A protein has these predicted regions:
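Hydrophobic alpha-helical core bundles mediating ligand binding, dimerization, or RNAP-core interactions
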Residues: 40, 44, 51, 118, ...
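Glycine-biased, low-complexity coil/linker segments
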Residues: 18-22
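Acidic/histidine-rich alpha-helical segments that form the ligand environment
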Residues: 105-141, 149-163, 167, 206-208
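Short, contiguous alpha-helical
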Residues: 37-41, 48, 56-102, 143-208
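Ser/Thr/Pro/Gly-rich low-complexity, intrinsically disordered segments
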Residues: 12-13, 17
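Extreme N-terminal tail/first-helix region
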Residues: 29-39
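Intrinsically disordered, low-complexity segments enriched in serine/threonine/proline/glycine
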Residues: 23-24, 28
Length: 208
């Protein structure tokens, strides 16, 4: 039997199977946001586990003059987060008070300062993400006067932050040397790791 739907301006949008598209869309966006937050938390943890394996001097070590230290990358991430996520839904993500160039000059000099800036940036981002309401997904977001959907603006940062966190981990491995402990699957252990994971299919958390 063919179903016939008559939709007027006041009717909810309906799928061919009889579902409410608007309701389904809201549920989908909540699932998306939950997934995004989970991924951000994962990469945040990777960086923090790296901080824990690097001594204070190593946090500010540079391979050469053109390279960034872990401290500089943290400055950049914190600066970006504060700029992008402050008034996320109502103002351009590139704030006039941000000094991006200064983020790549050594300003942070201690581990305590580093962690303070780090947490300040992440707190700003998570607070912004958790404040997104159902109607906000329809809004336009601007970054340097370039229009984005809310999803695209989030995805932009979801690609940007892991890029720099990968740099943090790489520098951490160079600094720690033989004392480095793998943050994922140790070399030569993929087979045993996978065997353990597949003992209880469907019950394991994602791991890369």
């Amino acid at each position: 039997l063919k179903a016939i739907f008559v939709i007027n301006k006041t009717s909810p949008k309906v799928s061919p199977t009889g579902g409410d598209l608007e309701g389904a869309g809201g549920a989908l966006m909540k699932e998306y946001l939950t997934s995004v937050i989970k991924r951000f938390e994962y990469y945040k943890t990777l960086a923090e586990q790296t901080f824990g394996q690097v001594n204070d001097e190593g946090l500010f070590w540079q391979y050469n003059e053109e390279s960034n230290s872990i401290g500089m990358i943290v400055q950049h991430l914190a600066g970006n987060m504060l700029s992008r996520w402050t008034d996320f839904l109502t103002s351009d993500g590139e704030k006039d008070w941000r000094d991006r160039d200064a983020e790549f000059e050594r300003a942070i000099t201690t581990r305590t300062e580093l962690l303070t800036q780090w947490n300040k940036g992440w707190d700003c981002m998570f607070n912004a993400l958790n404040s997104i309401g159902d109607d906000d997904w329809k809004k336009d977001i601007y970054i340097r006067n370039e229009r984005h959907s809310v999803v695209d603006a989030i995805n932009r940062q979801l690609a940007h932050y892991p890029y720099h966190i990968g740099q943090i981990v790489f520098i951490g491995k160079m600094v720690a040397g033989a004392d480095w402990h793998s943050l994922s699957i140790p070399k030569g252990k993929s087979g045993s790791f996978n065997s353990e994971k597949f003992k209880n299919p469907g019950d394991n958390k994602a791991n890369v």
